[in-house]
């Protein structure tokens, strides 16, 4: 009875959240997984006269992985993720290093670097659609127009309609611009959290600035770097609005699974759209679950 009085009020307090999360998160995940094993609302199966709720097992997944378009979208996603993660980590660390050294008007620089985060992905995509205008002729705008005015016309290119590789890579440019400030804030907080005694001890031992950062400071930032990697990784998997704003859903060079899911939903092929969603969920799980296990073990060891 005493134990109930101890944890009972707390359970009562969090029970609404548990119920809402259980229904709107895990319940809908289960519902989507169930739909992905049927031919629900697929025009092709309905035209064939079969039940739209007929169970077909992993048929939708087999169809997706047998589709060249879906395989291409997975390759595009891989290119996007690599460019996005590497770019955001590089510029985030670079800006954190510059601010960590102590510069005048540091608050102004922090605000400038963090400002892109205050802009929605779609609004950012609209602006970058103009900057990355693919027209290289008289109607060129944005960067292509700037190159022409600066006498650097040889740098003009078609950006996101150029090739299967560079098309999706160019989409990562605005995404890197938008998230680098956030990564900078993480690394800067990590630098500021390192005790000054460690720096002084390393300098007394004769360590140069390069050795100080390489052997003392950077190892202290490894947990933050891992967290940043996981955050950027899962954000790259669900990137959608900025792609739609820049290139739309019909550009084969910038198609990713999220865009494929949107297209299938518009075609009322809800079963295959749900299958794409579950595939993305598995990818996210492959990123997040090992990180949670690693973090939990570290907490137990400490």
Language model regions located:
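Short, Lys/Arg-rich, polar N-terminal cytosolic tail immediately upstream
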Residues: 1-5
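A structural signal for multi-pass alpha-helical bundles of membrane permease subunits
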Residues: 6-302
């Amino acid at each position: 009875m005493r134990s109930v009085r101890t944890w009972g009020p707390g359970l009562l307090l969090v029970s609404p959240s548990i119920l809402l999360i259980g229904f709107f998160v895990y319940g809908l995940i289960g519902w989507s997984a169930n739909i992905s094993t049927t031919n629900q609302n697929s025009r092709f199966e309905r035209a064939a006269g079969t039940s739209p709720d007929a169970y077909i097992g992993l048929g939708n997944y087999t169809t997706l992985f047998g589709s060249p378009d879906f395989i291409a979208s997975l390759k595009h996603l891989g290119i996007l993720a690599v460019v996005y993660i590497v770019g955001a980590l590089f510029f985030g660390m670079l800006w954190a290093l510059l601010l960590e050294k102590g510069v005048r008007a540091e608050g102004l620089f922090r605000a400038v670097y963090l400002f892109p985060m205050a802009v929605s992905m779609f609004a950012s995509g609209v602006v970058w659609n103009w900057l990355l205008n693919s027209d290289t002729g008289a109607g060129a705008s944005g960067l292509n127009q700037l190159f022409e005015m600066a006498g650097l016309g040889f740098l003009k290119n078609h950006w996101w309609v150029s090739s299967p590789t560079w098309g999706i890579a160019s989409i990562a440019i605005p995404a890197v611009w938008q998230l680098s400030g956030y990564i900078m804030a993480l690394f800067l907080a990590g630098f500021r959290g390192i005790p000054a005694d460690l720096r002084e001890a390393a300098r007394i031992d004769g360590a140069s600035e390069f050795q100080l950062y390489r052997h003392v400071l950077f190892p202290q930032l490894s947990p933050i770097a891992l967290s940043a990697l996981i955050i950027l990784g899962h954000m790259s998997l669900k990137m959608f609005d900025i792609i739609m704003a820049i290139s739309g859903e019909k550009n084969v060079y910038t198609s990713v699974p999220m865009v494929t899911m949107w297209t299938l939903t518009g075609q009322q092929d809800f079963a295959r759209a749900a299958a794409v969603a579950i595939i993305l969920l598995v990818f996210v799980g492959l990123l997040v679950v090992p990180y949670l296990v690693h973090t939990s073990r570290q907490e137990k060891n400490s």
